[in-house]
Swiss-Prot record:
InterPro entries: Phosphoglycerate_kinase, Phosphoglycerate_kinase_CS, Phosphoglycerate_kinase_N, Phosphoglycerate_kinase_sf. PROSITE patterns: PGLYCERATE_KINASE. The keyword Cytoplasm applies. It comes from the Bacteria. It holds the Pfam family PGK. Pathway: Carbohydrate degradation; glycolysis; pyruvate from D-glyceraldehyde 3-phosphate: step 2/5. It comes from Aliivibrio fischeri (strain ATCC 700601 / ES114). Monomer. This is Phosphoglycerate kinase. Belongs to the phosphoglycerate kinase family. The gene is pgk.
Length: 387
């Protein structure tokens, strides 16, 4: 895909409007998880060091659109940036009719969702955003799947629209994993339901050499092989779909599983062959043989795309499958991309962050990209690059 990159532009003296993803959890006026801000800092620093007049904005939470609500203010983010950048960062509340900035100065524009017309991508608001800048930088992959005034409309109307370093890296990594992957490509899809990941599974079944399924999704595939899954979470109405997918793509299905009689953190894990699962059993994880077999598949992969844990890894007795998969990915010499909330939690839990080639910052956007959907913000950047 062809987009203009911020790093290729002359920024000195220019008014630069960065749409970042600063939607971070806040408690008692303090940022409690700074991962998204940390991811955005390099882009902000690059602009400041280049002598640009820098504006950065984001949404935060879900306020009623068009109404100011202190609970959803970006003020805690401004306080964080003051410390992180060791400079005076201002928060602008009324900015739609213009604001004055000096070169090397940073202003945070208050929560875009306080502006009426943001979510509906209204032209009037988009043009007001665009009038603030010489260069619009889209750097929020996490909201690239939404056509909103601050992610799409502004870019259509700004003098120049480009991809920030974070977004550019994301598109490059996902493109490398999906558009032109080194083979074999192994995709791992976990999660509770086939229905929520059906488009992902269908899309990946067409490009993956092997498609590994885990979590509740795997139970539907175990049932599709004719085995009893007891009281496990599975979708009987999607068994035929699972069988169809298994004909189209190599999907290694678990041969042994970790079961219990109740969904309980302290429940003892009972390892069983899939043919031995009883009517009152609930499958919560892969068994050791299945984990070892999948680890070997991952070990031979040249490209790995990972979305979702393969068991109830939050419970100590049912973490072995996801731990084994994580270890195999960490030890793999292949190019690995991971994304999705639960996946990131697993990466943190098993301490493999440094060993994954690329960790995606987007939840819904990551899934939509993997589904093969066009992301509106990316389509806008491609269109502007042609102009």
């Amino acid at each position: 895909m062809s987009v203009i990159k911020m790093t290729d532009l002359e920024l000195a003296g220019k008014r630069v409007f960065i749409r970042a993803d600063l939607n971070v959890p806040v408690k008692d006026g303090k940022v409690t998880s700074d991962a998204r801000i940390l991811a955005s800092l390099p882009t902000i620093k690059l602009c400041l060091e280049a002598g640009a007049k820098v504006m950065v904005t984001s949404h935060l939470g879900r306020p009623t659109e068009g109404e100011y609500n202190e609970e959803f203010s970006l003020a805690p983010v401004v306080n964080y940036l003051n410390d992180a950048l060791d400079c005076d960062v201002k928060l602008a509340k009324d900015y739609l009719d213009g604001l004055e900035l000096n070169a090397g100065e940073l202003v945070v524009l208050e929560n875009v969702r306080f502006n009426k017309g943001e979510k509906k991508n209204e032209e009037e608001l988009s043009k007001k955003y665009a009038a603030l800048c010489d260069i619009f930088v889209m750097d929020a992959f996490g909201t690239a799947h939404r056509a909103q005034a601050s992610t799409h409309g502004v870019g259509m109307n700004a003098p120049v629209a480009c991809a920030g370093p974070l977004l550019a890296a994301e598109l490059e990594a996902l493109g490398k994993a999906m558009s032109n992957p080194e083979r074999p490509l192994v995709a791992i899809v976990g999660g509770s339901k086939v229905s929520t990941k059906l488009t992902v599974l269908e899309s990946l079944s067409k490009i993956a050499d092997q498609l590994v399924v885990g979590g509740g999704i795997a139970n539907t595939f175990i049932a599709a092989e004719g085995h009893n899954v007891g009281k496990s979470l599975y979708e009987a109405d999607l068994v035929e779909t699972a069988q169809k997918l298994m004909k189209e793509c190599a999907i290694p299905v678990a041969t042994d599983v970790a079961c219990a009689k109740a969904f309980d953190e302290n429940a003892e894990a009972e390892i069983k062959h899939v043919s031995e699962v009883q009517d009152d059993d609930m499958i919560f994880d892969l068994g050791p043989d299945s984990t070892a077999a999948l680890a070997e598949i991952i070990g031979n992969a040249k490209t790995i795309l990972w979305n979702g844990p393969v068991g109830v890894f939050e419970f100590k007795n049912f973490e072995a499958g996801t731990a084994g998969i994580s270890k195999a990915i960490a030890e793999s010499a292949g190019f690995s991309v991971a994304g999705g909330g639960d996946t990131l939690a697993a990466i943190d839990k098993f301490g493999i962050k440094a060993d994954v080639s690329y960790i995606s910052t987007g939840g819904g956007a990551f899934l939509e990209f993997v589904e093969g959907k066009v992301l509106p913000a990316v389509a806008m950047l491609e269109e502007r690059a042609k102009a």
